[in-house]
């Protein structure tokens, strides 16, 4: 059995994401961990596939993303890449793998060799030198600000960020700093809608929201969440797109359409 498919659309590249942002076309992003789903998500028109350290939660049963290793991410990145999707492949740098610019470079090289076309790392202003170090060495970078799950213990739990004036000011500083360092994409997680809107207006690069409101350049969800596969209470920023759909493909197509036409997220999914 093969998961390869003939390309039905042009490849989504880093410059393509910038062009989409500049043209006002929303970017649809989902997590992905294997070849089968990579082919399906690509067929549904997803623009970006994220091999997220969320695999620690949804695949490994961990309560946080902290136990996920670089080898874990590399393995799943290679699995996704074998499907040869037109979608851009972005891979997370796990906790503890980018403490210095040199560490980040070594880790990123492993993920790029596995098939990643961009790496994502959590943090803002303090990571500017690392972002610059990677970009200067031809590694595209996606930054992640707001609620950064690898900082769960520092935050005291999974809490909305940027609610205070000081917090909002720092988030804007973080976003502008990583952009100045060369980041080409930025994920904003669990921050007030107005703050995400303000940041998106101030930034030149695309912003991808998850619990950050409608005004971001695009949206991302964990694949399992948007298919209704989550134990316990549904996170506020999640919509179950599987409801009322005849197939997983149809559910993913509905997600892509909702992101593109601006009907997702709704007010009930934001802070």
From Swiss-Prot:
Q: Where in the cell is it found?
A: Cytoplasm
The note on cofactor binding and number reads: Binds 1 Mg(2+) ion per subunit.
Q: Where is it mainly found?
A: cytoplasm
User: Binding positions for 3-methyl-2-oxobutanoate?
Assistant: 53-54, 92, 120
Q: Which cysteines are joined by disulfide bonds?
A: none
According to the UniProt record, one GO cellular component term is: cytoplasm
Which amino acids does the record list as binding Mg(2+)? 53, 92, 122
Q: What is its EC number?
A: 2.1.2.11
Q: In which pathway does it act?
A: Cofactor biosynthesis; (R)-pantothenate biosynthesis; (R)-pantoate from 3-methyl-2-oxobutanoate: step 1/2
Q: Which cofactor does it need?
A: Mg(2+)
- The broad enzyme category this protein falls into is transferase
Q: Keyword annotations for this protein?
A: Cytoplasm, Magnesium, Metal-binding, Pantothenate biosynthesis, Transferase
* Gene Ontology process terms (BP): pantothenate biosynthetic process
Read off the Pfam families from this record: Pantoate_transf
Q: Which reaction does it catalyse?
A: 3-methyl-2-oxobutanoate + (6R)-5,10-methylene-5,6,7,8-tetrahydrofolate + H2O = 2-dehydropantoate + (6S)-5,6,7,8-tetrahydrofolate
| Highest taxon listed in the record's lineage | Bacteria
The positions flagged as active site in the entry are 189 (proton acceptor)
Q: Which GO terms describe its molecular function?
A: 3-methyl-2-oxobutanoate hydroxymethyltransferase activity; magnesium ion binding
The record's subunit annotation is: Homodecamer; pentamer of dimers.
Q: What does this protein do?
A: Catalyzes the reversible reaction in which hydroxymethyl group from 5,10-methylenetetrahydrofolate is transferred onto alpha-ketoisovalerate to form ketopantoate.
Question: What's the family?
Answer: Belongs to the PanB family.
List the protein's name: 3-methyl-2-oxobutanoate hydroxymethyltransferase
Tell me the organism: Paraburkholderia xenovorans (strain LB400)
